[in-house]
């Protein structure tokens, strides 16, 4: 943007910007007001009346302000002289801002708006929600069109969109026009590249449509994961810079109009703001992934940015302490790759950080109401909201990015739901908002229907799909990628030690809300009695429980019925909440035979990845969420020890595969988990619509060891 020549205009622009900023202190936020919801439309109309018209009071105020401008003119001129050396920076900034000229919304620029997805989707008069009440939008969503297609970089997807909304993914060249050319050039030339990488280009084609995206098949730590992060970071920064550019242009327009109303013959819509400043919310599970995201974000700051305030502090606080070594990385060959990639570096899960972006600087650790981007963990954000009783800073989020949602499933999913429920709510306070410049759809409470949500995970789950359905209502449409089972759809049975007998028992789950009770009933009345009747499975049995709530229920049941289960029955239990001494005692007692059964949660395996020895029978209360955990657990007797008690030998002696067995409980509602383990074809047969009642599927060893996973037989006996 070119600097305003008249110093009075310069000061007026500054004053206009200041008036649009929240005026709250940087201290503790006030408690949430329980007063009736304000009529924001009435407030906005009143503010607009003050702007329009040339009343005598307004004229006197303008003259008084002009006197103050004259007094400050000399000071401003001195400051402008000191900025002579910044001519090159100013020129770059002008070029950077001019690249966003399509953002301007005037009656004569409708064709430009149509070409710019940002203006068409987030503009003040967007046709996506104009003229429709919230109830109508919600009712229409139930009737959205649905279909399947194949997208570059995403593979097969399910798309959902309102009738009449065109959300087709455009070609690369056309899609990149939606982004600032300076950012595209950075993407093209960073790391010595000469063109936009294919993965980033494919993702930008999708993101530029402003649709919601659920992508449940990105492998943590992979090159693809990093490329997706880079594309999303550029997309988010482009949104922040376009928003800022429009506001600055309108500030200049209003400043000129205030001094000389006749200078603006062309009408201009200056409704460019929202209730609060933050526009991008980025949720990650640990500080290590937050650090990676911020490194991508700052790489796409404007070329005029000469300072990133508190960035060294951010890097220090989100990395390991100085001088500390990462023992997990040093012993990477002892752990699966996904475990190392997830837990290397700083894995604190309670953090939040505001990032403010201005023309010449960026600031880390900005107060939320002054930030453009909020980076946080679900737990960290929830802690802040509950402490201050304030979530208004989430009222104007326009881009939501949630990374590693599979990890959040292993933390506390309720924290994610807590944050999602508070997005785009009508604020309790005005926070210094200039209502004359607030976009109408904010005042109408329709922001949730325009927010773009980008959800990334390494696997699919009912929880993710439910969140995508209930919390994402983007009127530009929604895309959900369809993941394939591992090994090209064949699952992971080929990784299980050969000769190990596997029994998959399907129970009738009833309705969704009945499934937990049905599973518990099936286990306690059929599975457990069968185990106790056998001389083999009545001891050295490991029970793997994916859900912590099911784990607690089983543990209480076994404790309560200890005497009824047999005089020699005993068990130990370890979960993600067990401390190291408790874990060591339980592992030692189970291995030495002092405890017949060992209960373990999937979260314990996720966080610790210990190899538990002594088991000959493996019972899965439900299929594990992570498919690789199935062959990992069944390989415990054959793998080298890790973090073992000092008394334990290096392996289970004289292990014969024929002595081992696995029992898996599942229902039709476990189809996503079953598919990842046994493969798509067998999962459809085991969990399909015609798979009703109780059935048992037994995997029997094949004679030819060279046969591949797709040839593994699952024979059915109807129960």
Predicted regions: what is each one?
Residues 231, 235-244, 248, 265-272, ...:
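Conserved interdomain hinge at the start of the Helicase C-terminal
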Residues 460-477, 613, 625-719:
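A conserved SF2-helicase RecA2
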Residues 225-233, 253-263, 269, 273-340, ...:
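Conserved Walker A/P-loop ATP-binding site and its immediately adjacent core
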Residues 353-357, 368-385, 590-607:
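Conserved two-lobed SF2 helicase motor
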Residues 371-383, 388-434, 616-625:
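SF2 helicase catalytic motif II
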Residues 364-366, 542, 552-559, 565-607:
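Conserved helicase ATPase core of P-loop NTP-dependent helicases/translocases
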Residues 1-22, 28-161:
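Acidic, serine/threonine-rich intrinsically disordered low-complexity regions
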Residues 398, 599, 610-622, 661-663:
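A short beta-strand element within the Helicase C-terminal
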């Amino acid at each position: 943007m070119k600097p305003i020549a008249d110093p009075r205009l310069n000061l007026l622009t500054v004053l206009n910007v200041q008036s649009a900023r929240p005026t709250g202190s940087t201290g503790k936020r006030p408690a949430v007001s329980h007063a009736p919801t304000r009529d924001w439309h009435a407030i906005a109309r009143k503010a607009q009346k003050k702007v329009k018209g040339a009343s005598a009071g307004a004229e006197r105020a303008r003259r008084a302000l002009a006197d103050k401008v004259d007094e400050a003119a000399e000071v401003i001129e001195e400051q402008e002289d000191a900025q002579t050396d910044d001519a090159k920076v100013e020129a770059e900034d002008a070029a950077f801002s001019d690249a966003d000229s399509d953002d301007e919304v005037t009656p004569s620029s409708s064709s430009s708006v149509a070409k710019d997805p940002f203006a068409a989707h987030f503009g003040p008069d967007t046709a996506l929600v104009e003229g429709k009440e919230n109830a109508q939008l919600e009712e229409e969503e139930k009737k959205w069109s649905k279909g399947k297609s194949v997208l570059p970089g995403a593979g097969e997807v399910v798309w959902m969109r309102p009738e009449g909304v065109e959300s087709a993914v455009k070609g690369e060249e056309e899609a990149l026009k939606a982004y600032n050319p300076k950012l595209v050039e950075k993407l093209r030339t960073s790391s010595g590249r000469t063109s936009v990488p294919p993965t980033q280009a494919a993702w930008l084609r999708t993101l530029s449509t402003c649709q919601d995206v659920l992508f449940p098949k990105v492998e943590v730590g992979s090159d693809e994961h990093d490329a997706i992060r880079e594309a999303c970071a550029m997309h988010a920064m482009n949104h922040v810079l376009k928003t800022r550019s429009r506001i600055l242009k309108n500030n200049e327009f209003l400043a000129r109009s205030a001094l000389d109303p006749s200078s603006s013959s062309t009408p201009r819509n200056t409704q460019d703001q929202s209730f609060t400043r933050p526009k991008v919310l980025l949720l990650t599970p640990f500080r290590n992934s937050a650090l990676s995201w911020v490194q991508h974000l700052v790489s796409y700051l404007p070329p005029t940015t000469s300072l990133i305030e508190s960035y060294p502090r951010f890097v220090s606080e989100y990395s390991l302490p100085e001088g500390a070594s990462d023992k997990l990385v040093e012993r990477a060959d002892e752990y699966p790759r996904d475990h190392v990639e997830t837990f290397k570096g700083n894995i604190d899960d309670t953090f939040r950080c505001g990032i403010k972006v201005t023309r010449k600087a960026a600031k880390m650790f900005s107060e939320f109401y002054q930030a453009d981007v909020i980076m946080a963990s679900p737990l960290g954000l929830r802690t802040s909201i509950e402490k201050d009783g304030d979530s208004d800073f989430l009222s104007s989020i326009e881009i939501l990015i949630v990374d590693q949602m599979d990890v959040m499933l292993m933390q506390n999913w309720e924290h994610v739901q807590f944050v999602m429920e508070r997005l785009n709510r009508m604020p309790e306070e005005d926070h210094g908002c200039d209502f004359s410049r607030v976009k109408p759809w904010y005042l109408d409470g329709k922001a949730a229907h325009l927010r773009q949500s980008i959800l990334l995970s390494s696997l699919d789950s009912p929880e993710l799909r439910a969140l995508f359905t209930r919390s994402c209502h983007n009127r530009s449409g929604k895309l959900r990628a369809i993941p394939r089972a591992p090994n090209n759809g064949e699952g992971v049975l080929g990784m299980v030690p050969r000769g190990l007998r596997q029994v998959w028992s399907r129970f009738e789950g009833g309705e969704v809300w009945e499934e937990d009770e049905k599973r518990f009933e099936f286990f306690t009345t059929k599975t457990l009695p069968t185990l106790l009747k056998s001389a083999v499975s009545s001891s050295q049995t490991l029970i793997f429980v994916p859900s912590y709530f099911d784990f607690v229920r089983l543990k209480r049941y076994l404790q309560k019925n200890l005497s009824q289960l047999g005089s020699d029955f005993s068990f130990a239990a370890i979960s993600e909440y067990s401390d190291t001494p408790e874990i060591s005692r339980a592992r030692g007692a189970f291995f030495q035979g002092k405890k017949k059964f060992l209960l373990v949660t999937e979260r314990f395996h996720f966080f610790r990845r210990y190899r538990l020895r002594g088991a000959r029978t493996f019972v899965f209360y439900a299929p594990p969420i992570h498919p690789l955990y199935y062959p990992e657990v069944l390989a415990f007797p054959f793998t080298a020890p890790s973090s073992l008690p000092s008394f334990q030998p290096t392996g289970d002696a004289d292990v014969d595969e024929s002595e081992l067995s696995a029992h898996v409980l599942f229902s039709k509602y476990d189809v996503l988990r079953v598919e990842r383990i046994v493969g798509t074809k067998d999962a459809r047969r085991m969990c399909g619509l015609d798979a009703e009642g109780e059935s048992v599927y037994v995997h029997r060893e094949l004679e030819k060891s060279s046969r591949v996973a797709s040839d593994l037989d699952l024979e059915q006996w109807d129960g």
